[in-house]
Amino acid sequence: MKKIGFIGAGNMATAIIKGLMAQNDGKADFINVFDVSEEKCAAMKNMGANVMTSADEIAKNSSIVVLAVKPQNYPEVLESLKNSITTAKTVVSIAAGISIAYVRKGLECDCPVVRVMPNTPLLLKKGATALCPSENISDEDKEIVYNMFAGSGVCEYIDESHMNEIIAVNGSSPAYIYLFAKAMADYAKNCGID
């Protein structure tokens, strides 16, 4: 099995990692993780993942590198990966608003990239994920990335030209629906309904 590296170990990365583990009999020995938070690293180590000390180390020791950081952190992360990402590696971006071209430009590399828009129901294994691969991804890596998300819901490959609409409909809307449902429940509780 190819090594899959995660830069960032927040809620979404953790959900993806748990989905991968569920597909692999609970094993996490093929998963490498780096996060700036020692607490998150400790949690990943307890799950059985290989915790590394830098983003660069993740890139050097992983065939597929998942960028699971907030969009505002991309410039710094991409800069730190410039010397370790090659065209032999596949980069997966799960940040809203970050295009394939942006990732390649930041890395100064024409590596395979998969732009992904998961949504929060992925945390409950009920996600709907849109994936957009670059033209130079191998069939093997395309299948691996698809399966990373298929274990936690449904997946669909789309053209990158539709990604902004997908972000609005699929990526952001579940949070608003949750907020609306919570407001309804709070209202009922305030009316004495328990």
What is the predicted role of each segment?
Residues 1-60, 126-127, 189-190:
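NAD(P)+-binding Rossmann beta1-loop-alpha1 motif at the extreme N-terminus of oxidoreductases
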Residues 4-6, 31, 65, 92, ...:
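Hydrophobic packing within well-folded, soluble alpha/beta domains
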Residues 16-17, 81, 184:
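Hydrophobic residues within alpha-helices
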Residues 47, 55-60, 64-67, 71-131:
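Rossmann-like NAD(P)(H) cofactor-binding subdomain of soluble oxidoreductases
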Residues 102-112, 128-166, 176-194:
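Internal alpha-helical scaffold of NAD(P)-dependent oxidoreductase catalytic cores
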Residues 169:
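Alpha-helical membrane segments and immediately flanking helix-loop junctions
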